[in-house]
Amino acid sequence: MTPVELAKYLDHTLLAPEATSRDIAKLCQEANEMNVAAICCSPSFLPLAQGLLSSQIAVACVIGFPSGAHASEVKSFESATAVKNGATEIDMVVNLGLVYSAMWLELGDEILAVRKSVGTLTKLKVIIESAALTDEQIIMACRVAVTNGADFVKTSTGFHKS
């Protein structure tokens, strides 16, 4: 696989809390040059990113970031608002407390609520922080995510201490 072919599978991401509009503009310029699958940014920069990207590049937004401990209603509202502001993909961080507590029904309800808030045309990626989980927790979190509407499962935010 060539670098150009590989780029079509990558998300170019900038989620640092101190990221500036100039940083996001640079992210989008690089994404356009590399022709990546998507960029991922925080909700506050969605309109800027949307205006700077080629139409072939998806715009992903993090939800419940970075801890995943937000209330389900907040995640649903944040997701719907992100789509309204130009996101075509949602990267939702799971509530690790639900995973550690084996509260699989509640986790499923949360994922399903976000799925319903964004509809079926928006890609939903669920971030599980796999380095912080046992193999059994990873398997269950993945099953719950896919069963409740996730299009992808991602391993990490890159912000968890593990």
At which residue positions do the language-model features occur?
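Alpha/beta enzyme core
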Residues: M1-M34, A38, S44-S162
